[in-house]
Amino acid sequence: MADSDAQETRPPAKDSPFSIKNLLNIEDKPTKPKNGLGSSKGVFESGFFSRLGDLSLPRFELPAQRIGLPAQYLERASAWWYPYALGTHFRTAGAEKVNQRETSPILDRHTPDPPKSDQESKEESADDEIALEESDAEEPKKETDQEDDWMRKGEDLESDKKPCRKKKTRTVFSRSQVFQLESTFDIKRYLSSSERAGLAASLHLTETQVKIWFQNRRNKWKRQLAAELEAANMSHAAAQRIVRVPILYHDSGAPEATGGPGTNSPGGQPLLSFPHHMYYSNAVPLLRPV
């Protein structure tokens, strides 16, 4: 009786974390998976590891040589290998540092993306198709805009180049200067440097102006000579041209029978000829007087 009373008065034993009840409670309350479970932030915010805080899990020692990350990242993220340290009751300063570094590009690069539902994938594909159609419609507009810009740039460059061209100044000579230059040119076609300098000083011109005038005058003289030679050649060719006039004549053949008695043949012989000359005797009166 004493043993039975002691058993009845004994307080109920505290449920251990490994009891079936606790394990079933985890399965009875399934949590909806969030989109951020694949990222490190979703893992820390979810209550999965918080429920495992009371569990004593062994520490995993991973060599730094077999992992692609350097040893310094493994040392900083040591709290990753202690799941029980992520619980609500055993949150330490190391876990807080991990939460601060969870948004680093190195950790996000190695975490897988969360699975997307069919509806979300369809919406994204529809958005991509709309974006592609808009981009295709904008491409010809961009091309036309680029062509217009190119044409404008070309016009601007042409307008910029036009004022840069310098107009050649033409020297106007007086009548006395032209007369003196012409008379000198008739005497001598080419001038020496000393003669050109003396002529320029006498006419109050520069040597370059005199030199250019003589060059232009020689070109004009050569053109005049070429035109005169061409005209002389044409007149000589016209004089040597032979004009042939057709001459009408008849071939020497048989006399034509259609000719009259008074006509002559082409050979000069009469068409009707008699072999003997006709002699007439004295006239005999046909009627005798009675």
UniProtKB/Swiss-Prot annotation:
Q: Which gene encodes it?
A: hmx3b
Quote the cellular component terms of the Gene Ontology held in the record.
Answer: nucleus
Q: Which UniProt keywords apply?
A: Developmental protein, Differentiation, DNA-binding, Homeobox, Neurogenesis, Nucleus, Transcription, Transcription regulation
TM helices/strands, residue ranges: none
InterPro entries the UniProt entry points to: HD (IPR001356), HD_metazoa (IPR020479), HMX_Homeobox_TF (IPR051300), Homeobox_CS (IPR017970), Homeodomain-like_sf (IPR009057)
- What ranges does the record give for the region Disordered, renumbered to this chain? 1-41, 96-169
Tissue localization of expression: Expressed in the ear placode and vesicle and in cells forming the vestibulo-acoustic ganglion.
DNA-binding region, residue intervals: 166-225
UniProt biased composition (Basic and acidic residues): 107-124, 138-162
Which terms does the UniProt entry file under GO BP? cell differentiation; nervous system development; regulation of transcription by RNA polymerase II
The protein, known as:
Homeobox protein HMX3-B
Q: What does this protein do?
A: Transcription factor involved in specification of neuronal cell types and which is required for inner ear and hypothalamus development. Binds to the 5'-CAAGTG-3' core sequence.
What's the family? Belongs to the HMX homeobox family.
Compartment annotation: Nucleus
* Cytoplasm recorded as keyword: no
